[in-house]
Amino acid sequence: MTEHVAIVYWCDGAGHAARAIPVAKEFRSRGVEVSIGGGGPGERFVDLNGFEQPDLTTVTVEGATPRAFLEHTLFDLVPSSVRRLREVTTWLRTEKPDVLITDDVFAGLAAAGLDIDFYRIDHLTTDLFGSIWGPPLAVYNQVSLRFAEGIIVTSLWPDDPAPEGTTRVGPLAQEGEASDDIEPYDVLLNPGSHGDHFGEIRTRLETRGYDVRTVGDDDWETKPTMTPYTAAADVVVCTGFSSIADTVVAGTPCVIYPFLPFQRALAERAEAKHLTGVSMATTVDRVIDRVEAHVGSDITPDYDNGAPAFVDAVLAGIDDTA
């Protein structure tokens, strides 16, 4: 019987913590003890949801030039990686969880070294990519599956066949109760960690008379979940998968405006599948066009939160190996 679960989320961007939170809350709702940590931009959101966390070294990849990247790697990335691996190993040894959930390579290494069962969480599969990004992800998956119990992928198409060793579940959303203190509005802009041109998008939409809010702007009040904001909007423009998940589970139309290669690959697949209430834009003009099509429309996405299915998959897998 699984009584104690540890979750370690990656520390780059808030999205990794965002998808860990619904999994942690679902385990906790079933009476399972949850220990969680990761650090970085998502740490405060985990705190807001009532979880205590260890103090872990964060790891960043930086450098605008080859020399800057090399200097950062030698003097920051490598030392930080060593410290994080050591800290996560010590923490897991102390916590003694029955199973670990993680998207952190150092946590996976630590779990393998400590002989702790673990599942890797992801939102990408090799079929999304061509010859550049597909092979490295395939190798990473193969190596992961030599040590992990499996890979669980949070997906906008959870019923599609999954690669061997992989289980698909629905989008993992920071779901909560809609809030009466947030008035309905037209457009929510969520630039994430890598978005660009969102200032221009807001200006152009407001010029056309739309009521627009931007995540993190001056009048933004951070809440434990995104549901009050995504549910109050007519449409959301965002970049990363965790923001997409928060939007579609709330039943709000979503315009995916990708920047990173992984974001673009996922957005292109979503566009090709003609998902209800979900569209892609790669230019500011196209964003404006898609927003105007969605505002006031009665065509909305219909997704259940994938957290219950995620936890079911973990518990079933652990029971099978017990």
Residue spans of the language-model regions?
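Catalytic binding pocket for nucleotide-activated donors in carbohydrate/polymer assembly enzymes
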Residues: 244-285
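A short, glycine/small-residue-rich beta-strand->loop->alpha-helix junction that serves as a flexible
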Residues: 7-21
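Conserved catalytic-core segment of nucleotide-activated headgroup transferases in glycan assembly
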Residues: 19, 23, 174-220
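Conserved nucleotide-sugar donor-binding subdomain of glycosyltransferases
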Residues: 69-109
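Leloir-type glycosyltransferase catalytic cores
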Residues: 150, 157-160, 274-322
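Conserved nucleotide-sugar phosphate-binding/catalytic loop shared by glycosyltransferases and other
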Residues: 3, 11-14, 29-79
